[in-house]
């Protein structure tokens, strides 16, 4: 049976990992064994954080809506409840944008929510 020389394949695999680790600090970008672990861990963090990003943005939107709603004399939960009763179907992302960039429109939404609750 002929001998299999895998130097080309190994070199390509190592180059691929070291390319992915470019920009990492110290040995993490130069030593294959360390770089491999760093790339694997980076992938795990990226996977986890893609899911966490969605939660974090929702938290941010809710915090912004709550702050704007309280400036208009209503709590977040009552505001959302009022919008549901008034059958206003605007998601939290858009509500947060309105709260930040268009105060008058947000005040109108608050009045609509208050009217639906009364």
UniProtKB/Swiss-Prot annotation:
Write down the superkingdom of origin.
Answer: Bacteria
Q: Which GO terms describe its biological process?
A: ribosomal large subunit assembly; translation
Signal peptide residues on this chain, from the entry's feature table: none
Q: Which UniProt keywords apply?
A: Ribonucleoprotein, Ribosomal protein, RNA-binding, rRNA-binding
Please give an example of a GO cellular component term from this record: ribonucleoprotein complex
**Which InterPro entries has this protein been placed in?**
Ribosomal_bL20, RIBOSOMAL_L20_CS, Ribosomal_protein_bL20_C
Recorded GO MF terms: rRNA binding; structural constituent of ribosome
| Record carries keyword RNA-binding | yes
Function noted in UniProt: Binds directly to 23S ribosomal RNA and is necessary for the in vitro assembly process of the 50S ribosomal subunit. It is not involved in the protein synthesizing functions of that subunit.
Give the family per the record: Belongs to the bacterial ribosomal protein bL20 family.
Q: What is this protein called?
A: Large ribosomal subunit protein bL20
Q: Which organism is it from?
A: Enterobacter sp. (strain 638)
- Upper classification of the organism: Bacteria, Pseudomonadati, Pseudomonadota, Gammaproteobacteria, Enterobacterales
User: Coding gene?
Assistant: rplT
């Amino acid at each position: 049976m002929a001998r299999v020389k895998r130097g080309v394949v190994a070199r390509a695999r190592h180059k691929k990992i070291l390319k992915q680790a470019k920009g990492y600090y110290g040995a993490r970008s130069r030593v294959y064994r360390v770089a491999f672990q760093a790339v694997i861990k980076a992938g795990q963090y990226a996977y986890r954080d893609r899911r966490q990003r969605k939660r974090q943005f929702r938290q941010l939107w809710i915090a912004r809506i709550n702050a704007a709603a309280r400036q208009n004399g209503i709590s977040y939960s009552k505001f959302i409840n009022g919008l549901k009763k008034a059958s206003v179907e605007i998601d939290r992302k858009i509500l947060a944008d309105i709260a930040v960039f268009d105060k008058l429109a947000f005040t109108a939404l608050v009045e609509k929510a208050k009217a639906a609750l009364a």
